[in-house]
Curated annotation (Swiss-Prot):
GO biological process per UniProt: translation
Native source organism of the sequence: Sulfolobus acidocaldarius (strain ATCC 33909 / DSM 639 / JCM 8929 / NBRC 15157 / NCIMB 11770)
InterPro entries: eRP_eS24_sf, Ribosomal_eS24, Ribosomal_eS24_CS, Ribosomal_uL23/eL15/eS24_sf
One GO molecular-function entry: structural constituent of ribosome
Entry GO CC: ribonucleoprotein complex; ribosome
UniProt family annotation: Belongs to the eukaryotic ribosomal protein eS24 family.
PROSITE patterns, per the entry: RIBOSOMAL_S24E (PS00529)
Protein name, as recorded: Small ribosomal subunit protein eS24
Keyword Ribosomal protein among record annotations: yes
Length: 118
């Protein structure tokens, strides 16, 4: 069994990579991470993106946090993260709303006000 990769998110939050799958077809690395944050809240997506980008020596805009799940009161979270090799693959495969969440951008939806303007 290979060595587990440790991720330090902050002073109170650390994690380990439980599964690391190299997906060559999608040109990405799929990570399943177990986060320990006992005594503090669930880490934010931005904190996770920064920590994962620094751990795997990649740009922050190539990291997409798919999901973060925490059981009530446990202090342990599970995160599902994709780390892409290039921006083109990320744009083709990930939904725009997820890309916007991780970068902090607001993506306008084409609601009723957008239809009235046309």
């Amino acid at each position: 069994m290979s060595q587990q990769i440790k991720i330090k998110v902050s002073d109170k939050v650390e994690g380990i990579v439980e599964r690391d799958i190299q997906n060559n077809v999608a040109n990405r690395r799929e990570l399943y991470i177990k986060l320990f944050h006992i005594g503090s809240g669930t880490p934010s997506r931005k904190e996770l993106v920064k920590a994962i980008a620094s751990t795997f020596s990649t740009a922050e805009d190539l990291v997409v946090v798919k999901k973060v799940f925490t059981n009530y009161g446990s202090g342990i979270s599970y995160a599902r993260v994709n780390v892409y090799k290039d921006k083109d693959s990320l744009q083709k495969l990930e939904p725009q709303y997820l890309i916007g969440r991780d970068t902090g951008q607001k993506i306008k939806k084409g609601g009723k006000s957008a239809q009235k303007q046309q």
